[in-house]
């Protein structure tokens, strides 16, 4: 312990990267949701909506790399990949929280967006001829209940928690990669 030098705080880098990730994923996610909500119901629209989560997740995983790069370059320091993992984890969790807040703010700006999105998705599913009507009715009821649950306080908190877990994990990994690339310890 006595040989360890005091390292500067990584929190400014974590917060900066988390805000960047949250804003970019919010904008991309909103763009895709607006596209679907403004489209005619079709299977193509359902496929596009299915890409929303993977695309925003791929964008979201850069947070750990951004934060570790920022921290390493700002202070011209090296640190182990464990510290990179920690930086990435915190970046992902904070990005999820900020993204959740962004989403709720946007619900105040356009309160009917998610309703229009749900209507388009359900309409697209209703057009599917390959599913028997009895199964289709059950699935549509389940979709409607899912959309209602997502707009409740419990659903919102559950969504933020899931997002924090996913973004925390992928950024833990990308933080390790960032530490290896930008802050490899001297040997």
Predicted regions and their residues:
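Short, charged juxtamembrane terminal tails flanking transmembrane helices
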Residues: 1-7, 180-187
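Transmembrane alpha-helical insertion/packing segments
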Residues: 1-73
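Alpha-helical transmembrane segments of multipass membrane proteins
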Residues: 21-32, 59-63, 95-103, 166, ...
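Membrane-water interface at transmembrane helix exits
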Residues: 28-37, 68-72, 99-107, 174-183
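Selective recognition of hydrophobic, aromatic-rich stretches within alpha-helical transmembrane segments
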Residues: 44-71, 108-111, 152-176
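Alpha-helical transmembrane segments with an aromatic anchor "belt"
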Residues: 70-93
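Functional transmembrane-helix hotspots
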Residues: 98-133
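Short membrane-interface loop/juxtamembrane segments of multi-pass integral membrane proteins
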Residues: 125-151
């Amino acid at each position: 312990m006595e040989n360890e030098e005091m390292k500067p705080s990584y929190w400014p880098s974590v917060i900066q990267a988390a805000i960047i990730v949250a804003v970019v994923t919010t904008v991309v996610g909103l763009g895709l949701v607006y596209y679907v909500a403004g489209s005619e119901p079709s299977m193509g629209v359902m496929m596009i909506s299915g890409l929303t989560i993977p695309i925003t997740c791929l964008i979201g995983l850069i947070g750990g790399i951004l934060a570790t790069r920022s921290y390493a370059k700002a202070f011209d320091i090296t640190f182990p990949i464990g510290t990179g993992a920690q930086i990435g984890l915190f970046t992902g969790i904070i990005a999820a929280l900020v993204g959740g807040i962004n989403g709720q703010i946007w619900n105040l700006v356009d309160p009917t967006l998610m309703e229009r999105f749900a209507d388009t998705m359900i309409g697209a599913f209703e057009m599917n001829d390959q599913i028997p009507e009895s199964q289709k009715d059950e699935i549509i009821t389940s979709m409607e209940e899912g959309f209602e649950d997502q707009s409740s306080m419990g659903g919102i908190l559950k969504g933020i928690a899931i997002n924090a877990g996913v973004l925390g994990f992928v950024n833990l990994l990308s933080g390790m990669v960032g530490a290896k690339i930008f802050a490899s310890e001297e040997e």
